Amino acid sequence: MTLSFRTYQPAADGITPDTARLQQALDDLDAQGGGTLVVESGRYLLGGLRLPSNCCLQLDEGAELIASACYDDFAHTTTLSVAELSDRAFLYARQQRNITLCGKGKITGSADAYFSAQPDEQGYRLPAQHRPRIVVLEDCEQITIQDITIEHAPMWTVHLVSCRQVNVERLTVDNDMTMANTDALNLDSCQDVIVHDCHLSAADDALCIKTTAKPPAMQYKAQRMSVSHCRLRSRSCALKIGTETFADIEDLNVSHCTLYDSNRGIGLISRDGGAFRRICFSDITVECVTAPPCHWGKADPIFISVRYRDPTIEPGVIEQVRFVRITGVSEGAINLHSTPAGYVRDIHFEDITLTQQPGDSTEQGLYDVRPPCNPARPTGMGLDNAYLVNPDTGRAYGVEAYPGGMPALFARGINGLTLHNMTLQRPSPLPVGWNHDAIIELAE
């Protein structure tokens, strides 16, 4: 069955709310057993919408869904999952199946309404405490997201929580690069996922695989995911696994991706008890440049870290990870950190060609193990451990200088590190503050 939204006589002017009409169309589709709802060209101002099973929401070229600038307009799409203090979504479904979002149209998130107009001295635009996520699907299966564009999200853009059989193809996310915590695509405790040919650009993580805290019935492992032929851009980490890791993350394959104009390239960060196993990155190009100090990372092309967040929760190990045919340029170093020692193990690098280049940031020559690092708030989240300044160093807690200067690869507390056919190109003569040793390995 196919329905035309035009038959519901929407205002389509971008000013008059069309929420009730679009929800009615979705409900009518559901009552008929499902099908496709075609949203024709026009600008539709909307609050929260609930998506039913067996639904294809098709946005025609020229169609623009505009998320309301008022958080109260999402009260009826309150989510079970919470991201920071965000418990509402623009497009929402829970325990539904066979949902498709597709078409050449776009979704606009009205992000400016939820952020301060100007960044502070750390480069941080202060967000409102309550901001809607754009797409939140919880405990759903048979999900397809294809061809749509999402712009200017005020919070996490696409958050798939405990979903199975997910296919994301040719998704474009283009968020404001001054707005933190606007992750492009978050795969949270999802299983059997394919992400292919997407372009994801955000100030926060472009693509993040995680296992957040959630009710036990929804707390699955994240496993069996394939990511390929994507272009990723981020002021934080272009392709991140973690930091929220309350369940294991296993069997991931990432290949033929370009990580460009990003602060940190690939990040694996374990904090909350879940282990990482059997992960492979291959045929990836990176370009890492130093971002403003509020963002985690110092232009590291590859970053692996295990450390405690909550002193009562032992962090999970990171093991059986391979990096093969990684090439590119960076202003920082490869960083591998395990605290306690030995929680990062069996890490293999093969056919790596990286060029390290000088930058103009005063932060070059530092490394960053956030979060958490603020001793006054050891279990804190968000701003507590994002960018509070250590009065002893004048830098954010967790941002430290390399012993003896910046190398090309810095490893501390790693067991079973294998380096095969690595080419690390560095300027000659070395800039002031760079270590003459390209590779530094410390026991702890």
What are these regions (language model features)?
Residues M1-E444:
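Extracellular/periplasmic carbohydrate-active domains that bind, remodel
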